[in-house]
Amino acid sequence: MANTLVGRKRIRKFFGKIREVAEMPNLIEVQKASYDQFLMVDEPEGGRADEGLQSVFKSVFPISDFASTALLEFVRYTFEQPKYDVDECRQRGITFAAPLKVTLRLIVFDVDPDTGAKSVKDIKEQDVYMGDMPLMTDNGTFIVNGTERVIVSQMHRSPGVFFDHDKGKTHSSGKLLFAARIIPYRGSWLDVEFDAKDIVHVRIDRKRKLPVTSLLFALGLDGEEILSTFYNRVAYQRDGADWRVPFDAERLKGFKASVDLIDADSGEVVLEAGKKLNARNARLIGEKGTKFLRAADEDLIGQYIAEDLVNMKTGEIWAEAGDEISEKLLKSLDDVGVTELPVLDIDHVNVGPYIRNTLAVDKNSAREGALFDIYRVMRPGEPPTLDTAEAMFHSLFFDSERYDLSAVGRVKMNMRLDLDAADTVRTLRREDMLAVVKALVDLRDGKGEIDDIDHLGNRRVRSVGELMENQYRLGLLRMERAIKERMSSVDIDTVMPQDLINAKPAAAAVREFFGSSQLSQFMDQTNPLSEVTHKRRLSALGPGGLTRERAGFEVRDVHPTHYGRICPIETPEGPNIGLINSLATFARVNKYGFIETPFRRVKDGVVTDEVAYLSAMEEAKYYVAQANAGMDEGRKLTDDLVVCRRAGEVIVVAPDRVDLMDVSPKQLVSVAAALIPFLENDDANRALMGSNMQRQAVPLVRADAPFVGTGMEAVVARDSGAAIAARRSGIVDQVDATRIVIRASEETDPTKPGVDIYRLQKFQRSNQSTCITQKPLVRVGEPVKKGEIIADGPSTEFGELALGRNVLVAFMPWNGYNFEDSILLSERIVKDDVFTSIHIEEFEVMARDTKLGPEEITRDIPNVSEEALKNLDEAGIVYIGAEVHAGDILVGKITPKGESPMTPEEKLLRAIFGEKASDVRDTSLRVPPGVTGTIVEVRVFNRHGVDKDERAQAIEREEIERLAKDRDDEQTILDRNTYARLAEVLIGQSPIAGPKGFRKDTTLTREIISEYPRSQWWQFAVVDDRMMTEIEAMQKQYDESKKRLEQRFLDKVEKLQRGDELPPGVMKMVKVFVAVKRKIQPGDKMAGRHGNKGVVSRIVPIEDMPFLEDGTHADIVLNPLGVPSRMNVGQILETHLGWAAAGLGRKVSKAVDAYLKNQDIAPLRAEMEAIYSPSELEGLSDEALAEAGNNVRRGVPMATPVFNGAKEADIETMLEMAGLDRSAQSTLYDGRTGEPFDRKVTMGYIYMLKLHHLVDDKIHARSIGPYSLVTQQPLGGKAQFGGQRFGEMEVWALEAYGAAYTLQEMLTVKSDDVAGRTKVYEAIVRGDDTFEAGIPESFNVLVKEMRSLGLNVELTSSKQQQAANDQIEPPADAAE
């Protein structure tokens, strides 16, 4: 360990007992490797392999026109440099992509009209632009329209053949109906299935079913061939009145004789009636030399004839293949003198007559009828002809354009059916179909097993590259049609490839995929862990996958093959449970898309260091021991019997039979679960919540790595890209808050710059509005090794993931404030900003060109006081650093409005004052309700050709200065390095020429050289030719580097000064970023790492919190009743170990203070060596040791890896070492009375997270606001600034109270009585508090609805009704 490192690193005490052999793969490798393989940006020697983008082009090209007079061929593709880099794309809201150029060759043929022979007439090659291809950033994400997105990998059913049954659900008898399904990568599905009558049917693409024999006829077999393919035959020979049948012991094994079996030759009984033919009997019969048995006519009846019996002379068919032998048929065959009868070997026990029965019910008997049937099923209503039917059948399964099994499908099919076709054979063959039907019939006969579709050998992963490949292929196929049409319609001799191609469909397919595919998701950027997890997610949903509604229980369940491949813990709660999974820590995806996990090889009971990655299919045949199996020093397995897994079963075997062993105990779980210490002591449901809630932890203002970690923290911080790792070794040259400059000391390649500049992100907004800010960890002059962490990011500390804070917890009730998982906090937590986070909100405003004239961004806004404009500059845009509150103006904007007719008063005012301000209205951007914060950034975008305002110019100047500084620093280091090398070459030489004033043949020394300006050193000429060429090469390279630097600077400046690409109609756009500081408050959700979540109920003054004897107050009080029923005991063990860590920290702190006081290192070294293992402190100098001690003053960090961590005894040892009680319980005193509580309380440090569910984002109040158009009721929800719903049950409550007037105003003036609510408002303004409720608008809606149904409903008041009744008096004689 380098001494320099200690200053920016904490040494963790490691509890793991099991040595890990395999290196954990990079956590975002899944994404990067897949996309790199798809793009293959750099063309290797000898051209690109046929995969990824290359294979897409190869599969679509060449394209020929309809007359085959021209051919458009694909030659190669190249990518140009992207127009903007990642940061520029983020800022400008554009897609990070590189232009794709494809070289195409157009060949035009001359066709001889008589012979039809072709000769090449003309060949033209051209590079064609095919749209932009999005590039992946270094962190495995894509920038689409300025936002970071992730393409989630999809789990789908592997192509190949699957055998299954309906579990007895289809038929009432509960009979198992077997089915086989051939699933291609693309093309028609083929199902072969049994029905309840044991007839075998076939379906194509889930359409109507046909007898399987029709498919076999279509493949070119006839009835006899079908039977001979599926059945063996037995020849019966006439022997007097009886028949002779060959004796075959294998065939008759297990056969129970109903009558005596008699040897046909000797006539003796070889097996008596009622006995079973077992292996011993069979052997004895064989030894006697029995070749034939005697069979009576009765034995033949019910058997089936194996081939057509034909009278050779007349051609008359006596019996057809497959006919059942009846007494009548047997007699007629005897009559014509048939002496040998070939019979199908069907015994109805081991071999069933299914195919023969199917053949019997099939009305087709020849190829033509079968093809017609298939055609009618696939294209109902079209009249078939033999040609169309043949072409259609061929295109279904045998045409590589339409049908593709893929390499995976072929490999799976070969494995399942014991075939040996090469994996380049991507279409179906006749043999494949026959093998499938055979295997299915064998299943029905009880041979073989059905497949488990949830086995990970039958599910594969489609990552970014493959998803993108399929999408791009679709785009190219759309394009192909257009190209063909265009080739036929233009004069082919004069056009170039460019004129034939319209790349829009291809570009649109890519855009559609990244913009709106279900698998292209807005990246979860809450914290570094959520980013990593999102990139490692596996979804069974999405196009070509399952849907939530259809997915059953089995698909969602944990399967034995998930071990080490998919995490059994981390999955969402709710409707997606089990459909969205996470890749396990050591898992990787192989070239076929199957998930592999590593194992160590075990040879003769000795564990080797050889690591093998195996997929679920390969693993099935081995005995696999667990990572914690007992071993001695020589790595020999010590147990008499070792617990192993094999093919999903757990068994015990002798050590010498073990083949493999797990590489690590944590290979079973995902990254998030591997971050939970004492995971093994938590219930699975709570572990699931713990994994999921860590992803919602908000980055805090001060990150604090956990006292009790698992050792995974550094890995996540590094691989997520949150913390910055050094790209090359070197020396730190400059450091400030926004960038680090490192001089690469080991760079030998002269073409690469000798300097690395790392830009740190400062207060950038993440996708979830959390704050991304990085801070340097290195000092000037420090040496840095490649891969070392040089800057911390959000939620990282000293290069370790730090999602929350270590707080002092007491497990005890406190006045009911921690009832039902509520959390009681101390005021110290708020005062010291322990759980304070910064959130950055983004607001944007656009100035458009409207019909009435352009909108304008300005400070000059009508009817706004100077006070309201105090934060705006002269351009009308808010200053950086201004503190703003709800309702404040951020950007002043005015919009022209149409001339409205003026009232006389207005005309008078106009005449007097000449006021012209009335024709614009104020449409400024204001701070929305509930937001208060500080402006941290403002960005101004202008359209091309629109003059930039003051503010835009200032921002541009600042940016150019920054770029110039970067260029100057690189130039300085380049100069320093080059001239140092030049001086080394020149010193000691005697040049024959030099700068002005140099006397030749003087031997150069450093003093002489330094008299001349550095730029003149190149003028020295030495005699040695070799050295002279070296100097010239050095100068050339120096000039080139200088030129490159300047060019890069000018390009960036040009991009800055160029206008921005804005949406149509937008002249100018301003984005304002407001940083909001959120302290913790009641209503915020917090959680530990063990699924122990709760809501803050109260924040108590520090003096009222329970305290220890030494006066230390608890920070947080949790309810002890939250532990037993939830069974997440890990939190208690974590608390104990955290308590020990803090105690040890106090001891180390005293020793460090003693060292600083009297410079005696011995006590500190003794203290540190007692805590850490010798390897952890190896090679530390005294200063480094003191620095390491200083870093652990607050607590000695521990690492307890999952399933391999601290045991109870280890925790007790640590507690004793820290001088604490072994029970980790302490006497606590009540903060309010000062009296001790009557029993000891568990107290210690627990790692708590503040989750993204903040009360500030949810709380909301409205007085007046927007109303729904139709019902006129207030809208709902915070986003719409809506009201509170007063629903049916609330109405019942008021009815129950008898609060009639309150109820009336709730349902009228406070809701949708339009006239009434206006009157109430006016009354309140007048200071009057009486009002009258009118008719709610929803009543009018109801009346309109009824009228639309043809019911004439009218609303009349009771007074009008009375008047109407009075008018209609009954006539006097009505009573008579």
From Swiss-Prot:
Key word Protein biosynthesis present: no
EC number of the protein: 2.7.7.6
Enzyme class: transferase
Organism annotation: Methylorubrum extorquens (strain PA1) (Methylobacterium extorquens)
NCBIfam families: PRK00405.1, rpoB
The gene coding this protein: rpoB
Biological processes, Gene Ontology terms: DNA-templated transcription
GO MF, one example: ribonucleoside binding
Keyword Transcription: yes
Protein name per its UniProtKB record: DNA-directed RNA polymerase subunit beta
Keyword annotations from UniProtKB, A to Z: DNA-directed RNA polymerase, Nucleotidyltransferase, Transcription, Transferase
Family: Belongs to the RNA polymerase beta chain family.
Catalytic activity: RNA(n) + a ribonucleoside 5'-triphosphate = RNA(n+1) + diphosphate
Database matches in InterPro entries: DNA-dir_RNA_pol_bsu_ext_1_sf, DNA-dir_RNA_pol_bsu_external_1, DNA-dir_RNA_pol_su2, DNA-dir_RNAP_su2_dom, DNA-dir_RNAP_su2_hyb_sf, RNA_pol_bsu_bac, RNA_pol_bsu_CS, RNA_pol_bsu_protrusion
Pfam family, one: RNA_pol_Rpb2_6
GO cellular component: DNA-directed RNA polymerase complex
Domain of life: Bacteria
Summary of subunit composition and partner proteins: The RNAP catalytic core consists of 2 alpha, 1 beta, 1 beta' and 1 omega subunit. When a sigma factor is associated with the core the holoenzyme is formed, which can initiate transcription.
SUPFAM superfamilies to which the protein is assigned, alphabetical: beta and beta-prime subunits of DNA dependent RNA-polymerase
UniProt function note: DNA-dependent RNA polymerase catalyzes the transcription of DNA into RNA using the four ribonucleoside triphosphates as substrates.
